Amino acid sequence: MAEAGPISTITIAFSSFVGVILGGILSDRWVQKNIRGRVYTGAIGLGLTVPALMLLGFGSSFVAVIGAGLLFGIGFGIFDANNMPILCQFVSAKHRGTAYGIMNMTGVFAGAAVTQLLGKWTDGGSLGEGFAMLSIIVLIALALQLYFLRPKTDNME
């Protein structure tokens, strides 16, 4: 554990930074050609977390775990870099603080629920399968994002 903590933290932090930069650049360019470019960019990021969760769940080697961390970090970075820009496509400036606060709080509640689930799966000896099952939830979120998020403008006034 003395090695696992720093290695996983550095891997995810570095790859998230890469994802944020790549996701921001891609999104800013894509939205100039397609109004849903930010949504698609966020979907790509979210999509990268699916194989990461599968690798975390079923990977049994150091390389698999590092690969999962890299995929998750890049994917989450791409996804996270686009949350506020996507929000701006749907919510006017006068309500963005409230909307972003609600969005963040929803994430905190979801994180708390997932932490509780992971604890139960750990106690039951099925943490790996639990991580893999989380990929199903991510796939559902990805499908919902692609189906429902249809912006009409890049910046709602």
Regions found by a protein language model. Name each.
Residues A4-I7, G37, H95-I102:
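Cytoplasmic loop-to-transmembrane helix junctions
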Residues G5-R29:
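Transmembrane alpha-helices of Major Facilitator/SLC transporters
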Residues A52-F58, M133-E157:
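Multi-pass alpha-helical transporter architecture, strongest
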